[in-house]
Amino acid sequence: MKQVTEQAEDFVDTRSSGTEIREFEDLRSDSSQIRMFDTWEDYGLKEDLLKGIYSIGFETPSFIQKAAIQPIIDGRDIRAQAQSGTGKTGAFAVAALQICDMSQDVTQILVLASTREIAAQNAARFEDLGCFMGARVALLSGGSPIAADKVALEKKPHIVVGTPGRVEHMININELSMDNIKLFVIDEADEMLKAGFQEQVKSIFRRITNKDEVQIAMFSATYDEEELRVSEEILINPVIIDLRYNDQTLKGIRQYFIDLRKEPPFRKGREDYLLPKLVTLYDIFRKQRLGQSIVFINSKEDARIVYDWLIRHEWECELISAELTQAERERTLNRFRGGTGRCLISSGLLSRGIDIQNLSVVFCLDVPSFERKSTYIHRIGRSGRYGRKGIAINIVYEHELKNLKAIERFYNTTIKELPADFSFQ
């Protein structure tokens, strides 16, 4: 049978329960098909939107963009799953701007994200793509003054991007109207449909005036059974896009571990426990020629220990964690994106959604629990963005290897022991 490829005018099948797009799998025949295109011009996009697309360097659609844009333009619900860094944000932003009527001074597109950082990044992408269209975009998220959000909404934005708590609050105080929403986007949907956000998302959805007609688009790199169940409650005859490349393996990212064997037998505190990992990390930094990297560790307390230790050893780095204010986190991200600091220490805020150009190496100083296994995929997905090559290094103790190997088996991926003569070049 015919397979989905990245060539122009490929087709995918539609089933009674929805349309399913899977790369590298045979397609079953059916009566209706969704067409994918190889160039932006083939979509019949607005001229000013095309100008915005080319102005930010989007030369051709990525595979997820080919698969997702047309169904949204055609009015379909979608649930999309694709590896990190493949252009999911661009997919829903382009489609949303195409269907948005800029002559109407009402909010038509609502995008929810789990953190302010991701929401801000999404809002910036809408602004960049819609810069020639007169698109008005409002960012609503915790950490910013309510008064500023009211001012933003008074400008009658076409598109609102925000975090669930702040969006729900602005709806409750009658500052954000749900009367004209035509597209509801849930980004990082696996996180948004978990218990922490699920009720807020459902509450916001219930407030949409025409919820029986509104389109819903869900995007994520991973989904668990619970999130899939919840999605089925609100999606109608959706297009299911599954582009995970062999059960979640992140294409282009080489994964390794360094086994430090036993953890320190005698220790006075967390720094003593982490010391062998810190020494190993520092040794790599000194001996290898690396660009910018991110170092992930689970807790904000441990992130502070790693940061302080590296600073004491005169290694230039930045720290981002929940202990910082929102303004401090934004300044840190902007400095790092601007080239300040060789590495960024993160307690997990950046494991989802954040795009940092020219990042090729991710270090993980611990292993997420198996229950939070998707965190591993999101962590290492910070490298190898948009088809570039990336490297992920897990620095672990012997007792952590069991969990790492369980994640390896679950995602049908390969995590090798780092060779002694390995070079990052």
UniProtKB/Swiss-Prot annotation:
Its main location: cytoplasm. GO terms for cellular component: cytosol. Its EC number is 3.6.4.13. A motif (DEAD box) lies at residues 187-190. One of its GO terms (molecular function) is ATP hydrolysis activity. PROSITE patterns: DEAD_ATP_HELICASE, HELICASE_ATP_BIND_1, HELICASE_CTER, Q_MOTIF. Gene3D superfamilies: P-loop containing nucleotide triphosphate hydrolases. It catalyses: ATP + H2O = ADP + phosphate + H(+). A motif (Q motif) lies at residues 38-66. The keyword Protein biosynthesis applies. Component of the eIF4F complex, which composition varies with external and internal environmental conditions. It is composed of at least eIF4A, eIF4E and eIF4G. Belongs to the DEAD box helicase family. eIF4A subfamily. This is ATP-dependent RNA helicase eIF4A. It comes from Encephalitozoon cuniculi (strain GB-M1) (Microsporidian parasite).
